[in-house]
């Protein structure tokens, strides 16, 4: 193996060595990098029993960059002492020297210098002793010469505290002769070529044995973002439960479908510019189902269907305002309206997973854009008990079995419930979703039969993803700060399997 001179030198030294060789000492003797000797050792190991190599770990001391500078030029305090003439030096001038600030305090501690605050030109620094011994420099030079063991532990700790010395673990090999030791070794073939087969030369050539423990080359392919992996799992759960996916391709929505159709009054705080992104162009939606619009207007302003309404002047121009949808319930309203137009009524299950937009303050857990998961069931005689049963089935498929329900308020559902789950990592109950039964004031103007009820629930996609993958800042999951390596390395998502550890749960 003439193409590797370090390997040849290793074999020659080993031939005459008594017992064996240390790889680090050999590297020093040959004047080469230790890694070059390690490479030669591993090449010989691959040839079989030519050598035996025992990996050893030893602690050693190395100088930091600052430590090397001090070993060469002296400590900061010594440099400060040498810079002070016999007549003294103004303290302000001393502090502007490269080693002034650090060296001044150390020299004062060593009682090498003193400060005269009564000087006419301001505080003045004078020498206290005629000469000094730079012990710090001497100790560092000992370490540099490989004699760190001559230093007392207290002296080493002092140098470490000043960040002049660091402890490292040096991994070396003790190399000795193997059963098949020889100074002349031939390179083993790594591949069987067509030429070897046709000429028959393969019979006389040594081949490198297969390493079945070696990792294969990772396939060069695209990688799904963790959000897409979790989204796929949620989608699969809905499909297993017999749901149909709603179209959610209209990010731009009219205020009518986003608010009014949901029996949300036009004076509601959520419709304020501080919470919603309104469009400048096009500012208004021109096409609305006017018959349905009139029924919604009457329900808001006058009441109906057993409700008193909100008793205010409902304005069409307010309902026409375009916005970035604040929830996918707008898509649910469209789907239910389309369902109401089909006669006779047919029970249906719908779901959607898509982006929504809120004009919120950005922080570690909130973005102006996020994903909402929503499930809707329309059927005859559905009650709150049906909703709780469906929620238990849904969250059980997510691996969440401990649930609690708390009464809540939503403008378009009554009764409404917040869903809580016991978080094993945080050791407390945390909110995982919102739910309710759609109000008759929302459903009957659409044209749905009076004995039809609609139950619905929703949750965000980002929160379970952050918990699943141990992410505690949403900006590390979405946006320009995302680490692409995280996308490459994130495992396949299984929502029915516990997250990685309680520590990652606490972080999320």
Swiss-Prot record:
A GO-annotated cellular component: cytoplasm
Phosphoserine, modified sites: 193, 301
Entry EC no(s): 6.1.1.20
Keyword Cytoplasm listed: yes
Major location (coarse): cytoplasm
One Gene Ontology biological process: protein heterotetramerization
N6-acetyllysine: residues carrying this PTM: 311
Matches recorded under Gene3D superfamilies: 1.10.10.2320, 1.10.10.2330, 3.30.1370.240, Bira Bifunctional Protein, Domain 2
Residues reported in the UniProt entry to bind Mg(2+): 414
Keyword annotations: Acetylation, Aminoacyl-tRNA synthetase, ATP-binding, Cytoplasm, Ligase, Magnesium, Metal-binding, Nucleotide-binding, Phosphoprotein, Protein biosynthesis
PROSITE patterns: AA_TRNA_LIGASE_II (PS50862)
NCBIfam families hit by this protein: pheS (TIGR00468), PRK04172.1 (NF003210)
Oligomeric form and interacting partners: Heterotetramer; dimer of two heterodimers formed by FARSA and FARSB.
Protein name (Swiss-Prot/TrEMBL): Phenylalanine--tRNA ligase alpha subunit
Organism: Mus musculus
Lineage: Eukaryota, Metazoa, Chordata, Craniata, Vertebrata
Designated gene of the protein: Farsa
């Amino acid at each position: 193996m003439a193409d590797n001179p370090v390997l040849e030198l290793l074999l020659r030294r080993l031939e005459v060595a008594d017992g064996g060789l240390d790889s680090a000492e050999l590297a020093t003797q040959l004047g080469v990098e230790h890694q070059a000797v390690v490479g030669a050792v591993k090449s010989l190991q691959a040839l079989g029993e030519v050598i035996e190599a025992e990996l050893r770990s030893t602690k050693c001391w190395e100088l930091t960059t600052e430590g090397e500078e001090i070993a060469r030029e002296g400590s900061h305090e010594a440099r400060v002492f040498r810079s002070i003439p016999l007549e003294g030096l103004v303290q302000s001038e001393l502090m502007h020297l490269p080693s002034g600030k650090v060296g001044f305090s150390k020299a004062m501690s060593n009682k090498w210098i003193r400060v005269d605050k009564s000087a006419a030109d301001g505080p003045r620094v004078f020498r206290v002793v005629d000469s000094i011994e730079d012990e710090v420099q001497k100790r560092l030079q000992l370490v540099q010469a490989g004699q760190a063991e001559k230093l007392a532990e207290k002296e080493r700790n002092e140098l470490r505290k000043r960040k002049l010395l660091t402890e490292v673990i040096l991994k070396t090999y003790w190399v000795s002769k193997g059963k098949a030791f020889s100074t002349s070794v031939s390179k083993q073939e790594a591949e069987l070529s067509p030429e070897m087969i046709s000429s028959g030369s393969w019979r006389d050539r040594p081949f490198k044995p297969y390493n079945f423990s070696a990792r294969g080359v990772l396939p060069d392919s695209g990688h799904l973002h963790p959000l897409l992996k979790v989204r796929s799992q949620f989608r699969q759960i809905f499909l297993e439960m017999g749901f149909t996916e709603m179209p959610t391709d209209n990010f731009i929505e009219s205020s009518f479908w986003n608010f009014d159709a949901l029996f949300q009054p036009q004076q509601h705080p959520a419709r304020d510019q501080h919470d919603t992104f309104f469009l400048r162009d096009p500012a208004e939606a021109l096409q609305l189902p006017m018959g349905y619009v009139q029924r919604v207007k009457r329900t808001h302003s006058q009441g109906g269907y057993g409700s008193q309404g909100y008793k205010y002047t409902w304005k069409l121009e307010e309902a026409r305002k375009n916005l970035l949808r604040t929830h996918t319930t707008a898509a649910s309203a469209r789907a239910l309206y389309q369902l109401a137009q089909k006669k006779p009524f047919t029970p249906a299950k719908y779901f959607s997973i898509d982006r929504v937009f809120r004009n919120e303050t950005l922080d570690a857990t909130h973005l102006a854009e996020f994903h909402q998961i929503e499930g809707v069931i329309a059927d005859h005689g559905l009650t709150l008990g049906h909703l709780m049963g469906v929620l238990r089935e849904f969250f059980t498929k997510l691996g969440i079995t401990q649930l609690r329900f708390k009464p809540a308020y939503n403008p378009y559902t009554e009764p409404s419930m917040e869903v809580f789950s016991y978080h094993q990592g945080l050791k407390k109950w945390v909110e995982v979703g919102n739910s309710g039964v759609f109000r008759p004031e929302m459903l009957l103007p659409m044209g749905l039969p009076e004995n039809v009820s609609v139950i619905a629930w929703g949750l965000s996609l980002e929160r379970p993803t952050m918990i699943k993958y141990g992410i505690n800042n949403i900006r590390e999951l979405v946006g320009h700060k995302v680490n692409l390596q995280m996308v490459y390395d994130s495992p396949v998502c299984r929502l029915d399997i516990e997250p990685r550890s309680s520590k990652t749960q606490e972080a999320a």
